[in-house]
Each structure stands twice: as C-alpha cells, then as structure tokens.
C-alpha cells in the first residue's frame, strides 16, 4: 500500500512540476540557460534587450533596419547586414512601390530572413 501511495505522490508531483508555467527563469552564472526566451524558446530576428533574472524572463526586441540575427542568442544587439557577406546572402527584389528592397538570408539558418528597404543598406 505504501508503494502505491508513494507512486501516486510521485506521479502528482511530476504533473504539478511539468504542468506549471516555469517562467520566470532564474539566471545561471548571470546568464540564462540556452533557449530561455519568451518567444517559443527562440530569438532569431531579435536580440536580448534584457537578460532574465529571478523575477522576469529575458526580453527580446526585434532587430532594426540593416541588422539581423539568425540563431538563439544572448547578444545585446543585432548583427549588421553589411558585415560578413560570406555568411549572408542578400537578395534584391522589386517591391510594390517599385523601390528595391533587400532580403537577408543567413546561410546557417535559411529560415531566418529580414526584409528592409534598400535605402537603409549600403
């Protein structure tokens, strides 16, 4: 009977622990663990504008014009699209208003892309 009771308590504990919202995340050595972000555990296209602490989650902010990120990150800012062209593909397209736009595709992460007006990129 005791083993059934202990098993039941263990089972309920697992449900309670796994079923609850585990946010906010406690920092580990001053940094959040990998993938501890509020947007589906991902931060591509955003940067960590505020790292988590014991009371709040990491806050992700979208990258601005001419910048991008393609992976989960703890970066305090987005990367410039004018940087390492060997890792980034730039594609010019014609927009509806006939002004060319730039789409940035990361070779490491082809799903991550950012579109912005060409006039903002040199």
Swiss-Prot record:
- Induction note: Expressed in the early phase of the viral replicative cycle.
Which UniProt key words apply to this protein? Disulfide bond
**Residue ranges that the Swiss-Prot or TrEMBL entry lists as coiled coil:** none
TNFR-Cys repeat positions in this chain? 42-81
The SS bond pairs are 43-52, 60-78, 63-81
The protein's superkingdom reads Viruses
Q: What does this protein do?
A: The protein is truncated in this strain and presumably inactive. It has similarities with variola virus CrmB, but the product is truncated due to several premature stop codon.
| Protein known as | Truncated CrmB protein
Q: Which organism is it from?
A: Vaccinia virus (strain Copenhagen)
The gene is: OPG022
